[in-house]
Design a protein with these regions (language model features):
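Sec-exported extracytoplasmic/periplasmic mature domains
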Residues: 95, 141, 173-180
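Conserved SGNH/GDSL esterase-like catalytic core that processes O-acyl groups on lipids
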Residues: 67-69, 75-158, 162, 194
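Substrate-gating cap/lid alpha-helix
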Residues: 181-196
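Generic structural signal for well-ordered alpha-helices
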Residues: 124, 168-172
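N-terminal secretory targeting modules
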Residues: 1-71, 75-82, 92-93, 129-134, ...
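Sequence-level detector for tyrosine residue identity
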Residues: 37-38, 43, 51, 89, ...
Length: 196
């Protein structure tokens, strides 16, 4: 089934926003087998129409107009929520000028997962020239642990971006020096894995 045909009933049944539809379209262009996964999760209670981004109202918020860069993988993308993540809710509800740089399955470490330059480090380097955020939000990826990436060691310089620690050190120190903005880091751990 074509991606466009596949998306018609999901959009209608789940009242998907245009943002989510575009996110899913781009993901399916790269990962056609995700159709099966999206079919399964479309019927989960948290993906019902009542939680659609279309039903969210904007409120007066101190975040209105704040440019926030979100760098991450599936959680930031909204993979389990049909492309509507917390980033989209902050945009709609609080008026955040969100930059959502998220690709499913990617890692912090500077190694290509699915295509060239899809790691957090590679995408971060692109954002350095394109963005000047008020806040930088970084998702700690569980994909690094799941793919047995090296943890690495804490250093003061010469960060080894082929390790989890080095990639984090590089992005944090570079963002602090370049953007001089608050940096928020979050994760969603798998409790059976000590790295997550």
């Amino acid at each position: 089934m074509s991606n466009e045909t596949f998306l018609i009933p999901i959009r209608q049944n789940n009242d998907l926003s245009d943002i989510a539809l575009n996110e899913l379209r781009m993901d399916l262009d790269e990962h056609a087998l995700h159709q099966r996964y999206y079919t399964d999760i479309a019927y989960l209670a948290g993906n019902s129409r009542k939680y659609s981004l279309n039903s969210v109202q904007t409120v007066a918020s101190p975040l209105i107009g704040k440019k926030i860069l979100f760098l991450g993988s599936s959680v930031t993308f909204g993979f389990g929520a049909l492309g509507e993540s917390f980033v989209d809710y902050l945009w709609k509800r609080d008026g955040v000028a969100a930059i959502k740089d998220a690709e499913n399955g990617t890692t912090l470490v500077d190694e290509d997962t699915y295509k060239p330059n899809d790691s957090y480090v590679a995408r971060f380097r692109e954002e350095l020239t394109e963005s000047q955020p008020d806040v930088f939000v970084l998702q700690l990826s569980t994909n690094d642990a799941n793919q047995n990436k090296k943890l690495g060691k804490i250093t003061n310089q010469n960060f080894d971006t082929k390790t989890i620690t080095g990639a984090l050190e590089y992005m944090i120190s570079t963002a602090q020096a370049r953007w001089k903005c608050p940096i928020l880091i979050y994760t969603n751990p798998y409790f059976a894995n000590p790295l997550c």
